[in-house]
Structures are given as structure tokens and as C-alpha cells.
């Protein structure tokens, strides 16, 4: 902003302003990079013009406690999806799931102090009037002071009738002490994300979670009075087989058995919700070279799982295929897709994230008019030697680390979390050499 003000005062040209802006660490100026393509459509070269860095390195907030935190939120007059206070405990993730873009690009881990979080929570509730608060992060239960924070907020939440909720939890560190603190307010359901139906596939994606971890957490929850559990999985993960798909139904049945074993009050019954999404390869992850399975194959796997879900108390929800296909196309796309997006918009495509507005036919017509094949982006396996459209951007994680993780996935070898062992991903360079794990 200061540079733009200076440009206006001194009468710079647009190009001069952009060149100066490119000198600011973390600023990417697309027009200062020339991209050439091979005959097969892959990227041949990405050349930085004079004044632009060859690779733009992401900038991060160094100290979360010193960063501005918005507690005076705008409260809309209509009901919205995120109708609550959302308290971010820390940024980054220690886990390293190989499919997760956020887990890579938000590295390194940087925690907020427990005392400041308590103050932020009180201010946000008092200023907004919300009666629901979510303690959010990529893996909330990995916050090192979570139990202490819940203790600090316990009396305040009880007095203000505020429900304290956690998003998807790690089943391998879910504790009874944590559950008891959640029970102080209005009880809500619990959500776990095993992601895959077999141990082999969970190891391949580096989930570092066993079925027994999940079942033990469910037993504790059911014994503590919970009667609703949501389980999140993905279909189409690299190396997935029908056995892995059917393993999801097996896990749901085992969770049902855990409820029968552990629930103290069975009169209310149990609600187990299994939700599956479609794997979308994302840039800057260990699976950025992987293809998305074709729509027909995804729908076959959904049908296979749906037919295997024959337990009355288990509800199965799945993500529609057309929107996930287009998400993969755009996620793995290059700058040529800009014209496609504009063409689709001119055809009337707006608010495409909503199924009511999304029209795959309009998108396919736009691709045809622009002479591009969407399957080239979504369903093609990429060589690790290929220049990727996002190669001029670095999130701090070394490309060699991603290649190593990619290879380990096919070997079924897991990588320990950052708190257990530093895996030398390279993201520590963003915070002076030491992560806050």
C-alpha cells in the first residue's frame, strides 16, 4: 500500500510499480514471468523478467502473539454458515499428511500463547454476542496447551451459556480429560477424520493413525455420553483399491460395535455419519504429481461403498463428482485457464462453489472454445522432472522433500510428526531456523 501511494505521488508507470512491487519479499507479479509450453502442453520454461526473483518465497507471520487478532467481528443480520466465534489456536500443522495442501503451505508451526487466546475468546464473545465458539486450527488437538485453555474458558463459557466446540479431532490423542471439558456446556457430536479405510492406505498417505486409535476414542466418547460421531474419508487416493473402499464400511460397522460395547444409555440410539470426498491433487504437496481418478471410476467406488453400508444407524454422504472434477482442473491448472474461467463466466457461470449454480456443461464448452482439455489437468500423472505451473512459487518446503514423501507413499512408509522428529522439510527457513513445535 505504501509503495502504491509512492507510485501515485511520483507518477510511476504501471510497469515500474510492478517491478518495484516484485522486490518486496513474498510478492508474486505474474506479468513479470514468461511461460513457454512444449508441444504436448506441458510447461517448457518459466523465465523471470529483469527485476523479478526467479522463485518467490512465501512470507509468514513470525510471532503469532505479536500479530493483530480481530475480536470485533461483524455480525450479520441473517444466519450464516460460520455463525460463531472462531478462535485460531496456532498456525501450521505437525502431522504431514501427504494429500493436505494446508499442512504444507502453512508450515512452520507457530503457536499462540494460552493467556492471549483466553483474552481473545472473552473479547470476541462479549463483542459479538455469539453463543458458540470453535477452537480452530488444522489439527486443534495438537495444540500443546489445549486442556489448560479449556480449563481457563470453562467458567466463562458456563456463565455466558457458550458452547465450546472442536473441529475434526485426532483420534490418537483424544483424551477423556478433554472430553469432560467439552461436556461442561451443551454437548455436541464428535468428528474424526481417518481419511482411508485400511491401515495400508493410511500409511501411504501418512495419516499415522490406527483403527484401534479410532475405536478407543469412540469407546471413550460413547462411555462419556456421546451418541453422534462423524467420520470423514476420501475416495480416489493414490494406490487405493476396492479393498480400501470397503474398509470404510468395515470401520463404520466397528464403530457401531464400539457403541454397543461402551454406551451407558442405549435408549437414544446412535448416529454415525460417514462422509467421503473425492481426492483432489494439490500443488505444493507430496501428491502434486498424482492424477485424479476419472469421474466414472469415482462414481463406481461411491456405489460400491454405498451398497456396503447396510447398517441402519449409519448415514453415508458423498461429495458430488462434477464440482470436485473442476476443482482438480483448476488446482492443477496453468495461466491458460484464465481465459477458460473468463469464458465460463461470460456464459453465465457464477457462484460455482454452490451446486445450485454449478453447470459442468458450461465449463466444458468454455474449455472447448479455448482449445484446452480439462482432463489434461485433472487426470494426467505428472513426471517428477516436469516443470510445474507453480514452480516459481515456494512455500518454504523443499521440492526434494516432497519427492521423498511421494516415494515413501508408494513404499507404505510413514514419516513421524514434527514434534516427534524434525524431518528437515525446509520450512524452518521462514522463521529464522527454528519451528515452534
Predicted regions and their residues:
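Glycine- and acidic
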Residues: 82-86, 98-108, 130-139, 197-204, ...
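Active-site lining segments that contact anionic ligands and/or coordinate catalytic metals
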Residues: 24, 64, 82-86, 94, ...
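Acidic/polar loop patches that form or flank catalytic/metal-binding clefts of enzymes
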Residues: 8-14, 36-39, 131-134, 161-165, ...
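Acidic, low-complexity intrinsically disordered segments
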Residues: 1-102, 108-109, 115, 353-357, ...
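Glycine-rich beta-alpha loop elements in corrinoid/cobalamin-binding modules
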Residues: 1-47, 286-334, 341-355
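A glycine-rich phosphate-binding loop feature that marks nucleotide/adenosyl-phosphate handling sites
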Residues: 17-31, 138-143, 167-173, 236, ...
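Radical SAM enzyme core and accessory elements
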Residues: 310-437
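Conserved SAM/AdoMet-binding glycine-rich loop
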Residues: 122-273, 277, 281
Amino acid at each position: 500500500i505504501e509503495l502504491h501511494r509512492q507510485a501515485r505521488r511520483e507518477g510511476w508507470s504501471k510497469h515500474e510499480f510492478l517491478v518495484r512491487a516484485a522486490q518486496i519479499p513474498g510478492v508474486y507479479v505474474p506479468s513479470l514471468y514468461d511461460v513457454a509450453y512444449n508441444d504436448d502442453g506441458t510447461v517448457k520454461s518459466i523465465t523471470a523478467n529483469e527485476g523479478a526473483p526467479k522463485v518467490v518465497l512465501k512470507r509468514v507471520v513470525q510471532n503469532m502473539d505479536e500479530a493483530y487478532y480481530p475480536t470485533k467481528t461483524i455480525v450479520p443480520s441473517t444466519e450464516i454458515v460460520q455463525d460463531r466465534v472462531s478462535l485460531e489456536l496456532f498456525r501450521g500443522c505437525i502431522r504431514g499428511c501427504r494429500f493436505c495442501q494446508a499442512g504444507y503451505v502453512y508450515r512452520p508451526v507457530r503457536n499462540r500463547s494460552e493467556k492471549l487466546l483466553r483474552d481473545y475468546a472473552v473479547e470476541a464473545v462479549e463483542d459479538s454476542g455469539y453463543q458458540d465458539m470453535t477452537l480452530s486450527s488444522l489439527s486443534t488437538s495438537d495444540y500443546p496447551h489445549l486442556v489448560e485453555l479449556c480449563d481457563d474458558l470453562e467458567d466463562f463459557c458456563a456463565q455466558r451459556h457458550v458452547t465450546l466446540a472442536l473441529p475434526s479431532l485426532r483420534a490418537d490423542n483424544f483424551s477423556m480429560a478433554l472430553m469432560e471439558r467439552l461436556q461442561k456446556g451443551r454437548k455436541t457430536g464428535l468428528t474424526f477424520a481417518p481419511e482411508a479405510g485400511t491401515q495400508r492406505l493410511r500409511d501411504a498417505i501418512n495419516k499415522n493413525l490406527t483403527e484401534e486409535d479410532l475405536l478407543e476414542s469412540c469407546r471413550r466418547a460413547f462411555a462419556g455420553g456421546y451418541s453422534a460421531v462423524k467420520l470423514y474419508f476420501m475416495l480416489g487416493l493414490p494406490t487405493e483399491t476396492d479393498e480400501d473402499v470397503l474398509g470404510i464400511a468395515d470401520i463404520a460397522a466397528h464403530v457401531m460395535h464400539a457403541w454397543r460395547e461402551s454406551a451407558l444409555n442405549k435408549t437414544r440410539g446412535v448416529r454415525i455419519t460417514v462422509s467421503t470426498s473425492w481426492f483432489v491433487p494439490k500443488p505444493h504437496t507430496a501428491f502434486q504429481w498424482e492424477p485424479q481418478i476419472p469421474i466414472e471410476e469415482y462414481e463406481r467406488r461411491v456405489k460400491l461403498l454405498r451398497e456396503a453400508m447396510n447398517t441402519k444407524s449409519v448415514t453415508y454422504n458423498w461429495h458430488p463428482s462434477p464440482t470436485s472434477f473442476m476443482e482438480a482442473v483448476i488446482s492443477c491448472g496453468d495461466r491458460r485457464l484464465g481465459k477458460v474461467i473468463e469464458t465460463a463466466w461470460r456464459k453465465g457461470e457464477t457462484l460455482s462453489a454452490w451446486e445450485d449454480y454449478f453447470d459442468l456443461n458450461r465449463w466444458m464448452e468454455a474449455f472447448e472454445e479455448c482449445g484446452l482439455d480439462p482432463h489434461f489437468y485433472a487426470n494426467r500423472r505428472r513426471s517428477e522432472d516436469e516443470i510445474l505451473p507453480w514452480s516459481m512459487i515456494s512455500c518454504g518446503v523443499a521440492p526434494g522433500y516432497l519427492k521423498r514423501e511421494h516415494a515413501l507413499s508408494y513404499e507404505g512408509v510413514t514419516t513421524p510428526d514434527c514434534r516427534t522428529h524434525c524431518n528437515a522439510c525446509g520450512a524452518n527457513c521462514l522463521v529464522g531456523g527454528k519451528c515452534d513445535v
